[in-house]
């Protein structure tokens, strides 16, 4: 971690989490996955239905938190997919896992790995990569997934 000692906080397994907006939601999963990769993301208040109230929290914060946009054709494991889930602005984040898979958490479901099917490709708004990302950073995420998850 750039020559510094990185202290990891305890996070629950990335899969199998119950959904509670603003507490254990898709952003929490994204934040915790990146923590396991050694990249800290801020926690911020997310009011219910923020995307219906004129806010655009993901697009307003991606660049400020170290992300830059990349072409969907250049997707690499660990990249963040922003999706429009019943909204006109991106209101859902998923981690691209490679080999056609993603990790995400949607309302009324447990967090899970899922195939990046046409359904999700149609909902995808954009793909983002963190400036500090490197391929080995995905190891912490992979280790957690191997310990606790299955494909749906």
Residue locations for each model-derived region?
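Short, structured interface segments
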Residues: 1-10
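Active-site nucleophilic cysteine motif
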Residues: 18-37
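Short, well-ordered, mixed-charge alpha-helical segments that flank or form enzyme active sites
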Residues: 2, 111-113, 136
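...with weaker cross-activation on analogous glycine-rich loops/strands in unrelated enzymes
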Residues: 8, 46-111, 117, 151
């Amino acid at each position: 971690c750039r020559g510094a000692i990185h202290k990891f906080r305890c996070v629950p397994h990335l899969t199998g989490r119950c959904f509670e907006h603003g507490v254990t939601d898709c952003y929490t999963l994204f934040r915790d996955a990146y923590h396991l990769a050694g990249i800290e993301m801020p926690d911020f208040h997310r009011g219910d239905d923020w995307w219906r109230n004129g806010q655009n929290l993901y697009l307003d914060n991606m660049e400020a938190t170290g992300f830059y946009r990349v072409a969907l054709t250049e997707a690499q494991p660990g990249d963040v997919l922003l999706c429009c889930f019943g909204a006109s602005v991106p209101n859902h984040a998923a981690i691209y896992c490679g080999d056609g898979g993603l990790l995400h958490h949607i309302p009324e479901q447990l967090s899970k790995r899922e195939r990046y099917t046409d359904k999700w490709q149609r909902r995808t708004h954009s793909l983002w990569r963190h400036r500090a990302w490197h391929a080995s950073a995905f190891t912490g995420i992979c280790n957690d997934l191997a310990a606790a998850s299955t494909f749906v």
